[in-house]
């Protein structure tokens, strides 16, 4: 079951550019992960492998700020605030998950159990289910 680009834009709340940006980050992350797993880049740290995700989150936040300012200037304040809160909630949960996962991979500490690491993803999935029900 594949979604069209229009459905992804409606459900996620991201613009097409932001979706492309996150797909690009996933592609670069996958290449870096494969290089580390195959031993071609053994000295590369996990923080360096996660840089594409961090960069995509930062650029998406910057894009959201620009769109919010433009919506405020056009007089669509309610839509601007709702979009800002939604996107920042998604990006912050995604960022917390990435940081916790990267910290677990680097340190291998027992204090970071996988239930704690996955909790932002579970919250994000619940929010996406609620948004999917509201969109349709």
UniProtKB/Swiss-Prot annotation:
It holds the Pfam family Tmemb_185A. It comes from the Eukaryota. Its main location: endoplasmic reticulum. The chain crosses the membrane at residues 14-34, 50-72, 81-101, 112-132. InterPro entries: TM_Fragile-X-F-assoc (IPR019396). It is found in: Endoplasmic reticulum membrane; Endoplasmic reticulum-Golgi intermediate compartment. Disulfide bonds: none annotated. It is a multi-pass membrane protein. Keywords: Endoplasmic reticulum, Membrane, Transmembrane, Transmembrane helix. GO terms for cellular component: endoplasmic reticulum; endoplasmic reticulum membrane; endoplasmic reticulum-Golgi intermediate compartment. Involved in the regulation of cellular calcium homeotasis. May act as a regulator of STING-mediated inflammatory signaling in macrophages. PANTHER family: FAM11A, B PROTEIN (PTHR13568), TRANSMEMBRANE PROTEIN 203 (PTHR13568:SF9). This is Transmembrane protein 203. The lineage of its organism: Eukaryota, Metazoa, Chordata, Craniata, Vertebrata.
């Amino acid at each position: 079951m594949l979604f069209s680009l229009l459905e992804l834009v409606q459900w996620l709340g991201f613009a097409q550019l932001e979706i492309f940006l996150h797909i690009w980050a996933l592609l670069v992350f996958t290449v870096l992960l494969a290089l580390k797993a195959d031993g071609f880049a053994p000295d590369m740290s996990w923080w360096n492998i996660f840089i594409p995700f961090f960069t995509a989150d930062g650029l998406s936040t910057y894009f959201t700020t620009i769109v919010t300012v433009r919506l405020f200037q056009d007089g669509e304040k309610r839509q601007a605030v709702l979009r800002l809160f939604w996107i920042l909630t998604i990006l912050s949960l995604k960022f917390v998950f990435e940081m916790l996962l990267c910290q677990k991979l680097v340190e291998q500490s027992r204090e970071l159990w996988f239930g704690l690491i996955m909790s932002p993803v579970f919250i994000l999935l619940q929010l996406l289910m609620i948004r999917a029900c509201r969109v349709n």
